[in-house]
């Protein structure tokens, strides 16, 4: 999977709460074009949270496709994600989309890519985007070694990613299930 130089999305589940966060920076070449973009959303009547890293237009198009699949499969996130990944890999139009997504409901958390990947992590922590490795590392350390809430873990992980990754800012949007 190629590294997406665009943003950071981090998602953590703990004590029945699922929290997703995304930074607001949009970078075009070497310039910051916007500092307050919204790259995370709630879908399917607010029961599923989704975030994307990569091209904004592509990420939004994929969110729309995922929402269609969720409606078709009555909110079954795993089934919708697998069907989206199959379409994404085989459809001529979708194959060109450059984004990676994370999605979660109250029970499952998934990374979805155009390579056909639908990955559920071993631990309830995922992060994607250019600052994803930093955010995931910080979130895993906090998850394993503290009693912080999911929200506190996500906030701190995003803060750390924003301090290290030049494509990630500290203008964080958070959604919670």
From Swiss-Prot:
User: One Gene Ontology cellular component annotation?
Assistant: proteasome core complex
Q: Where in the cell is it found?
A: Cytoplasm
Question: Can you state which reaction this protein catalyses?
Answer: ATP-dependent cleavage of peptide bonds with broad specificity
Query: What InterPro entries does the record point to?
Result: ATP-dep_Prtase_HsIV_su, Ntn_hydrolases_N, Proteasome_sua/b, Proteasome_suB-type
Report whether Iron shows up as a keyword of the record.
no
Q: Which UniProt keywords apply?
A: Allosteric enzyme, Cytoplasm, Hydrolase, Metal-binding, Protease, Sodium, Threonine protease
- Give the GO molecular function terms: metal ion binding; threonine-type endopeptidase activity
Going by the record, the broad EC class of this enzyme is hydrolase
- Chief location bin: cytoplasm
Q: What is its EC number?
A: 3.4.25.2
The record, for PROSITE patterns, names: PROTEASOME_BETA_2
What regulates this protein's activity? Allosterically activated by HslU binding.
Q: Which GO terms describe its biological process?
A: proteolysis involved in protein catabolic process
Give the active-site positions: 7
Q: Which residues bind Na(+)?
A: 162, 165, 168
Indicate the quaternary assembly: A double ring-shaped homohexamer of HslV is capped on each side by a ring-shaped HslU homohexamer. The assembly of the HslU/HslV complex is dependent on binding of ATP.
Record's PANTHER family?
Answer: ATP-DEPENDENT PROTEASE SUBUNIT HSLV, METALLOPROTEASE TLDD
What is known about what this protein does?
Answer: Protease subunit of a proteasome-like degradation complex believed to be a general protein degrading machinery.
- What does the sequence similarity comment in the record state about its family? Belongs to the peptidase T1B family. HslV subfamily.
Protein name from the UniProt record: ATP-dependent protease subunit HslV
Q: What is the lineage of its organism?
A: Bacteria, Pseudomonadati, Aquificota, Aquificia, Aquificales
Q: Gene behind this chain?
A: hslV
